[in-house]
Amino acid sequence: MEIILGIVQGLTEFLPISSSGHLSVFSKLFNLKPDLSVFALLHLATLAAIVIFVGKELTEIIKGLIKLEKNYINLTLKIIVSTIPAAIFGVLLESKIEASLSNLKIISFFFLVTSAALLISDKIKGNKDLSTLTYKDALVIGIMQALAIFPGISRSGFTLFGSLLIGLEREIALKYSFLVSIPVILGAGLLEIKNISLNSYSISSAIVAFFFGLLSLFILKKATISKNLKIFSAYCIFISIFSFVLGGIK
């Protein structure tokens, strides 16, 4: 079962279909108790995949900070601004998040919200690069990321949606959406890491999540550039209906 959760986490963490929503659905389907510490371990595994995916950008930022280059200092500050709302929401709404993990009817609604955001994202045109990003833009993206703390709302989908809304070019929007997710995923994982029980099963699950995470990143990149997010939008409608029905049965 841990391997299955690893596959689900790896594929759904970056594909814009909500990993937390899917993990909740699978937990309910197989009568597993939602465990935020397990989710945190899987998040840390997929975090490693993000670091590889945006490795070039991260290296440039680190080098720029070491050299005290103004544009990289400003970019780092904007990434921090995009992170703050999620941190605040996470602290204030922790109990509600845990409750929503077991309520499939609420998750079903949030899947529909994600579907709508993806459908709109396919129609947005942008040509801005990161040099034009303002602190207000960064805050908008941060609010989108904050909303994604609820299962069913995709973090990658909503941060990408926010990045496109403020006019970023599609591939740049995708890369920025993952740059701003790094502190949030890392923070969530570190907060729960003290409760994680490492064993052969959990480690295997994390390794599987890492490799499937890499696969899903490249799938999302292709879908974003070719404006095929509608495929994931349609899937979110399907999983919304499925989770709603499952919530009524279980």
Swiss-Prot record:
Q: Which keywords has UniProt assigned to this entry?
A: Antibiotic resistance, Cell inner membrane, Cell membrane, Cell shape, Cell wall biogenesis/degradation, Hydrolase, Membrane, Peptidoglycan synthesis, Transmembrane, Transmembrane helix
EC number(s) per UniProt?
3.6.1.27
Molecular-function GO terms, alphabetical: undecaprenyl-diphosphatase activity
The source's superkingdom equals Bacteria
Q: Which GO terms describe its cellular component?
A: plasma membrane
Could you tell me which InterPro entries the record lists for this protein? UppP
Q: Which residues cross the membrane?
A: 35-55, 73-93, 100-120, 146-166, 171-191, 200-220, 229-249
Report the family membership.
Answer: Belongs to the UppP family.
Which HAMAP family does UniProt cross-reference here?
Undec_diphosphatase
> Extra notes?
Bacitracin is thought to be involved in the inhibition of peptidoglycan synthesis by sequestering undecaprenyl diphosphate, thereby reducing the pool of lipid carrier available.
* Record protein name field: Undecaprenyl-diphosphatase
Per the UniProt record, the source organism is Thermosipho melanesiensis (strain DSM 12029 / CIP 104789 / BI429)
Underlying gene: uppP
